[in-house]
Amino acid sequence: MLQNNAGDALAISANGSFTFATSVASGGIYAVTIKTQPSAPTQICTVTAGSGNAAANVTNVVVTCVMPPPFAYAVNMTDNTVSAFTIDRASGALSAIAGSPFSTGATPSSIAADPSGKFAYVANSGSKTISAYSIDAATGVLTPIAGSPFAAGLSVVRGIVHPSGKFYYATVGVNNVVSAYAINTANGALTPVAGSPFATGSVPSTIAIDPSGKYLYVTNRSDNTISAYAVDATTGALSPVAGSPFGTGQYPFSITIAPSGKFVYVGSRYDGDVWIYAIDATSGALTTTASSPIYTSDEPWAVAIAPGGKFGYITNTTANTVAAYTVDTTTGAFTQLAGPNTSTGNAPTSIGFDPSGKFAYVVNTLSNNIAAYNIDASTGALNAITGGTYSVGQQSRSLVVVGQ
């Protein structure tokens, strides 16, 4: 949205010339500025030669809009900080954002962002709080929002933002609950949802929501189950799905959902397995697929599927590797790529992807760095980016990528 002389507003939807509704008298002053930056998609617009005296029709005002780069954020548990980077769309290289690292509460354990990229939320297990930040769309700088940090339960573990951007959910391991918050979409503030917290199994850890936002799933690592809930789209309240909780392998510690919303993948650290479940689109109930479980060995920590849904990846913390798979989008089955797994740093935990699906980023907790890889578009194989190792703080563990 443009404006002239701080009052005459004009919406622009395409390239080309534009004319404001209110004329400027000959010799009068004009001052064209950006009133509102575009949001779908997010762009950063600037005006060149936007002011002067109108001696005739003004034709030299130029508005230039560019998409901001994606940003990557990783929490550092020992340092109580978030390391922040811009992602180069062409090369996948990371560059530290000015002001990084940014302070969090004590022992940050996870970070999540809303789908619009406006807000980020850090679960602080040590201080029992959730730190909330606004994200500068142009620079990626994090700024604490008013009221942050927000109270959470004992040992808050993992958090996630609902696909609508209206709700935030966090597992609280000691209390055996998942806490739900409504997000003020204007300022990012959190308010507990009526009925929150909601009961889980024993020691809930990771959490996932299907892309439609209808169902939420929590892994319970002490009783080896998955709690499944229907999400009220209006209030954010959770209701257990019939048949929940569903059994899984020993010490389920990671969970992800296919971009199609058809399958759930759960990593069981003590078994060295990944369990695959089909989601009933009507009820949210889980059914083990014919190919489940698949054995990975080496203590699988994170399971992730790249954008597009064709390739899956499992971080093996003991072996210091990432295993790559092709994904059958019809059955959900994983088929491991031929050849050895991809080497990483020490104790790879989290893995994330740029929005295009061209690059993967692995957090190496004991190496205190992030390793960047090209994803082969045909096979899904990971190839290390030259010079693509980037320092973060101590005990970095959770990564989120923001952008489009």
What are these model-predicted stretches?
Residues 34, 53-68:
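Conserved "repeat-terminator" motif of extracellular CCP/Sushi domains
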Residues 66-404:
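Predominantly soluble domains enriched in secretory-pathway, periplasmic, or organellar proteins
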Residues 7-17:
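Short, acidic Ser/Thr/Gly-rich low-complexity loop/linker segments typical of extracellular
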Residues 1, 17-52:
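Surface-exposed interfaces of beta-sheet-rich extracellular modules
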Residues 34-39, 56-58, 325, 373:
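Secretory-pathway extracellular proteins and peptide precursors enriched for disulfide-bonded cysteines
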Residues 1-3, 59:
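Short loop/turn and low-complexity linker motifs enriched in small/turn-promoting residues
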